[in-house]
Amino acid sequence: MAEERSQRSRDRSREEKIDDGMIEKLVAVNRVSKTVKGGRQFTFTALTIVGNGEGSVGFGYGKAREVPVAIQKSMEYARKRMANVSLNNGTLWHPVKANHGAASVFMKPASEGTGVIAGGAMRAVLEAVGVKDVLAKAIGSRNPINLVRATLKGLEDMQSPTHIALKRGKNVRDFSHGS
């Protein structure tokens, strides 16, 4: 019972499903100040992830004087910039390395029932895209924006064996292990 409650509260923490079936996740909110003649002016930035849980995902970064407006802007931007990712029954096709700036990510497929073993910003992207089982590690910078970009870059660069076979003009069976 207690385990169920903790699981429920952890899932609810930064996730929201809307009418159109999209999964929205708030990754980070940051307060930025600008010093002017009359004092400090505060603005807020929001980093959000939007996905359909079936291979489509996008991220947005919004800025505004108030937090809700910044979140709304970033959600709209994320919906405009959706990318499609090829998945293999809820996991990845092959191990992937990608980086953006000093943030590097390493993701590898996991067997069914493993779950999403990833931290912070990477977890939000992987859950929104619909990955159920994956082992992931962030290396280098832990800047949320760069981690999100690196994770998306890795997922977009991943190719299914069928796609590789088509590109090379070969049969998929030629890529099986042990041949």
Swiss-Prot record:
Organism superkingdom: Bacteria
Keyword terms of this UniProt record: Ribonucleoprotein, Ribosomal protein, RNA-binding, rRNA-binding
GO molecular function, one term: rRNA binding
All copies of domain S5 DRBM, residue ranges: 22-85
Extent of the signal sequence: none
SUPFAM superfamilies: dsRNA-binding domain-like, Ribosomal protein S5 domain 2-like
The UniProt record lists the keyword Ribonucleoprotein: yes
GO terms for biological process, alphabetical: translation
One Gene Ontology cellular component annotation held by this UniProt entry: small ribosomal subunit
Xref: InterPro entries: Ribosomal_Su5_D2-typ_SF, Ribosomal_uS5, Ribosomal_uS5_bac-type, Ribosomal_uS5_C, Ribosomal_uS5_N, Ribosomal_uS5_N_CS, Ribsml_uS5_D2-typ_fold_subgr
Role: With S4 and S12 plays an important role in translational accuracy.
Complex formation: Part of the 30S ribosomal subunit. Contacts proteins S4 and S8.
Note on domains (UniProt): The N-terminal domain interacts with the head of the 30S subunit; the C-terminal domain interacts with the body and contacts protein S4. The interaction surface between S4 and S5 is involved in control of translational fidelity.
Family to which the UniProt record says this protein belongs: Belongs to the universal ribosomal protein uS5 family.
Descriptive protein name: Small ribosomal subunit protein uS5
Species of provenance: Xylella fastidiosa (strain M12)
Lineage: Bacteria, Pseudomonadati, Pseudomonadota, Gammaproteobacteria, Lysobacterales
Gene symbol of the encoding locus: rpsE
